[in-house]
C-alpha cells in the first residue's frame, strides 16, 4: 500500500473526537496527515469541543483538548495532497466562509481525490458547491444544506453509527460512526487492514 499524504482542515472548536480519532487512525494506517487551520501556523493549537448525546433535543457541548497543528494553512499547496478530511464541530461554521478553504475543497472534488467529512464537516462541502448530485450523510441539522445545494441527504441511523460512500466522498453523521467512516475511507484510499 503506498503511503498517502492527507490534508485535514480544522479550526477552533472542531469536535474533539472527530479530529483526534481520524488523525490517529490515518497515522496508524501508515499515512502522512497534515492538519491546518486558516490564520494559524504549524505548532499552533486549535481548541476542540466535545459534543455528546445526553438525551436533550440536541447535542451538548463542552470544552475539549487542544489539538496541535503540524501544517501552516497559508503555505498549503493542495495539489501535493492525495486526500482531504473535514471533521465536524463548530469549526465548519466559519471555515466555510473562507474563500481559500472553499478553493482547496473544490480542488479535491474536481480532481476526484478522496474526501472524508463527518458531522458538520459537510457544511464546508455545501458552501464549496461540490455536493451537486452527490449523496451525503451529515449531522441531521446539516441535512437542509446538503439538499439545498443539490445533494441527497443520507439520514443517520438511530445510533448515528452509519457511513455513506458516493464515489470518492465518504461521509458520516457524527463520531459514533468512526469505525464505519474510517473503514470506508481507508478502503477508498486503497488501504488494506487485515487481521
Where are these regions (language model features)?
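Extended, subdomain-level signal for the structured scaffold at the beginning of enzyme domains
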Residues: 1-111, 124-135, 143-195
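Short, thiol/selenol-centered motifs that function as redox-active sites or metal-ligating centers
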Residues: 118-121
Amino acid at each position: 500500500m503506498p503511503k498517502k499524504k492527507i490534508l485535514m482542515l480544522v479550526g477552533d472548536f472542531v469536535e474533539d473526537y472527530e479530529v483526534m480519532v481520524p488523525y490517529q487512525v490515518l497515522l496508524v494506517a501508515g499515512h502522512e496527515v497534515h492538519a491546518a487551520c486558516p490564520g494559524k501556523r504549524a505548532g499552533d493549537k486549535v481548541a476542540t469541543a466535545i459534543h455528546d448525546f445526553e438525551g436533550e433535543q440536541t447535542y451538548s457541548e463542552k470544552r475539549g483538548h487542544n489539538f496541535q497543528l503540524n501544517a501552516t494553512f497559508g503555505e498549503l499547496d493542495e495539489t501535493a495532497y492525495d486526500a482531504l478530511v473535514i471533521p465536524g464541530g463548530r469549526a465548519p461554521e466559519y471555515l466555510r466562509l473562507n474563500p481559500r478553504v472553499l478553493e482547496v475543497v473544490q480542488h479535491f472534488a474536481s480532481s476526484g481525490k478522496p474526501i472524508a467529512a463527518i458531522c458538520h464537516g459537510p457544511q464546508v462541502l455545501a458552501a464549496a458547491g461540490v455536493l451537486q448530485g452527490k449523496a451525503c450523510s451529515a449531522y441531521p441539522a446539516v441535512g437542509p444544506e446538503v439538499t439545498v445545494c443539490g445533494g441527497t441527504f443520507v439520514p443517520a441511523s438511530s445510533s448515528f453509527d452509519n457511513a455513506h460512500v458516493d464515489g470518492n466522498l465518504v461521509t458520516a453523521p457524527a463520531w459514533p460512526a468512526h469505525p464505519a467512516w474510517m473503514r470506508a475511507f481507508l478502503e477508498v484510499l486503497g488501504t488494506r487492514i487485515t487481521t
